[in-house]
Amino acid sequence: MREYDIIAIGGGSGGIATMNRAGEHGAKAAVIEEKKLGGTCVNIGCVPKKIMWYGAQIAESIHKYGPDYGFTSTGNEFDYARLRKNREAYIDRARSSYGGSFKRNGVDLIEGRAEFVDAHTVSVNGELIRAKHIVIATGAHPHIPAIPGAELGGSSDDVFAWEELPKSVAILGAGYIAVELAGVLHTLGVQTDLFVRRDRPLRGFDSYIVESLVQEMENTGLNLHTHKVPAKLEETEQGITIHFEDGSTHTASQVIWATGRRPNVEELQLEKAGVTLNERGFIQVDEYQNTIVDGIYALGDVTGEKELTPVAIKAGRTLSERLFNGKTNAKMDYTTIPTVVFSRPAIGTVGLTEEEAIKEYGQENIKVYTSKFVSMYSAVTSHRQEARFKLVTAGENEKVVGLHGIGYGVDEMIQGFAVAIKMGATKADFDATVAIHPTGSEEFVTMR
């Protein structure tokens, strides 16, 4: 039986970061992974998605904005196979880097599926492995609704396995994944239809920002269908036909489910360790990533808490600091987490939406500043693209509790503003900051 100070079940970003930090502090650590290192993010998530997004950005620059800048495209050929090949080569290089970090930090890689035997022991390929601390970082998988013919549709995982792009695609869902895939595929030339159950996509985001995204979808010909609940799918001569509860139908070459994710817990034998799930089926943890079992922890998507790769990484490193570096009170701060939706155009946000701020502070205690403009990049062309920015402040000193934007370059603006908001910046601090001109980000420090 091998014994460790700490092991991670799951070799995604969270598990890898946790073990590397533990190893840095001298702990004997191991990562257990049954598939590919890197998890969802590196292999079938944010990394290949971002590369596709860059591809869409280049296509847009060439064909949409290029002519007004004096560049004439001599052809419309797009070699998707080449993009796919280069994308996968990049991912292979990213995965190969883990070996070096494991070696530097003394972390073992154990390949296989882990199952709990008891609270401190797991079985991998029949071998028993024991550890004082066990971290569950197994991530999540796409949820496919239980309706007739659902298996005819694929998931976001399947998109990155396509050897060629389809003629048309129907995407079912309203969150990050649905919106990002819709924007990328549409910009790369796929006839794209996005179906949402309610009145708009991205319902957890500020409505002022989402309104602009919906308008841009309409402007560019990406078809958004609201109040559409799928009832069944069937294969037809024309493709895959979706039947909706309102009696309407839609046929596309491919159908993609982007209707949420479920935790990877089914094969862990959690009951043998005594680990419990919450009402949503995710592993229940406290603010220190502790499960109800002493010495067993969980982080990342398997907990259902802020399902973002940097969150899992930060939570894992913080946990290892607490366990192996004497920082006994170290815990992940889940407030004011910045995030970007790589829609077209991108959305960036940190802190509370206006709606959330009203609930937390009261309508009378908040003040909102907005700006609406056309970025210089598109303003000199015939394809003018709107940008919108918003600051949400609270209290007499107008502390900035929310910052939101949509438009060209927003994805690269948010990180710096997130630091300011984390430090408690006020509207007066923003006003006292000299703007950088001409940029989009100057709008955040010149709003009145």
Residue ranges and their predicted role:
Residues 108-111, 115-123, 188-287, 327, ...:
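A Rossmann-like FAD-binding core segment of flavoenzymes
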